[in-house]
Regions:
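Solvent-exposed loop and beta-edge segments used for protein-protein assembly and interaction
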Residues: 52-56, 84-86, 117-121, 154-156, ...
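Short beta-strand and beta-hairpin "edge-sheet" elements
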Residues: 89-133, 139
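Polar/acidic, low-complexity leader/linker segments enriched in S/T/G and N/D
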Residues: 1-40
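A structural signal for short, hydrophobic beta-strand segments that form beta-sheets
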Residues: 16-26, 106-112, 241
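Short, acidic/charged, Gly/Pro-enriched secondary-structure junctions
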Residues: 8, 12-13, 63-108
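Intrinsically disordered, low-complexity segments enriched in serine, threonine, and glycine
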Residues: 135-248
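Oligomerization/assembly interface segments of phage tail-like spikes and tubes
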Residues: 45-70, 119-133, 228
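Short, solvent-exposed beta-alpha or beta-beta edge segments that form flexible loop/patches at the rim
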Residues: 24-61, 110
Length: 248
């Protein structure tokens, strides 16, 4: 029995519409943003790294097969509409890279060149994706009830999601933050080091708590390549770290 490769976008698997992918051109890398500055009287240019990468266009060469012409047209139309109805970045995975995922937007494609009595065709499906290849392993939370360390297996700084119980000084990597005491010592303060937001869950909603943290140097924690210290100061009883490892 033939095994076909596929992609899944926001829970929609391409094989549900009879669409398979070949995988070519799925492995491209994003462009690093670098400003080149020339100085009068100086040979060459100075490269100033902007600390970020551009979005990347991910193209899946794909094909579809059906029992008849009407079925073929319906499958293509169904998948196109399902993909196009997502207006924000959604999770994108494929069977070529099962340990990774991207965040992307459907951009174009699914214009099939039909063959075999209009019951099969080939086409490209194009997504505009954020530059990171997120590792599935980076979604696994690690819990600390005492000081320890966490190891970043990649070469890129990760910006974790923290869930902190207690108050006091917390050191993660080279950054130190002070968690201000709250009414309940058992309440959990969530800190997103990517969006630089802090909040508590109250009832069914989130309440902003950015004023509950003080960052030394105004920097939020990052997990650098290799081992990173996790130091729980007096009063911090538990820290749960979702590391969000990524590569390009």
């Amino acid at each position: 029995m033939a095994v076909f490769n596929s992609f899944t976008f926001d829970g929609i698997n391409s094989l549900d519409s009879g669409v398979y992918i070949t995988g070519q051109a799925v492995f491209n890398a994003p462009e690093r943003v670098v400003e080149m500055v020339t100085v009068p009287g100086r040979n060459g240019a100075i490269a100033i790294d902007q600390g970020r990468f551009e979005n990347i266009e991910v193209t899946y060469p794909a094909g579809c097969f059906a029992d008849n012409q009407q079925d073929f047209a319906e499958k293509i139309a169904t998948l196109r509409n399902e993909l196009a109805s997502r207006y924000t970045y959604k999770r994108l995975t494929d069977t070529y890279n099962p340990d990774e995922f991207r965040l992307g937007l459907y951009r174009s494609g699914l214009e099939a060149s039909a063959v075999r009595y209009n019951t099969a065709g080939e086409f490209d499906i194009v997504f505009d994706c954020k530059p990171q290849r997120w590792l599935v392993s980076g979604e696994t939370a690690q819990t600390f009830t005492r000081s320890g360390s966490i190891t970043n297996p990649t070469l890129f700084d990760a910006k974790p999601l923290l869930a902190v119980t207690g108050s006091g000084i917390l050191t993660l990597g080279t950054q130190t933050m002070t968690i201000i005491a709250r009414a309940s010592s058992s309440s959990v303060l969530y800190i997103d080091c990517e969006s630089q937001e802090a909040w508590e869950v109250v009832g069914a909603g989130k309440v902003s708590r950015n004023d509950y943290i003080q960052n030394a140097g105004e920097e939020f924690s990052v997990l650098s390549a290799g081992a990173n210290t996790v130091a729980l100061g007096s009063g911090i009883t538990r820290v749960v770290i979702t590391p969000r490892w990524w590569r390009i």
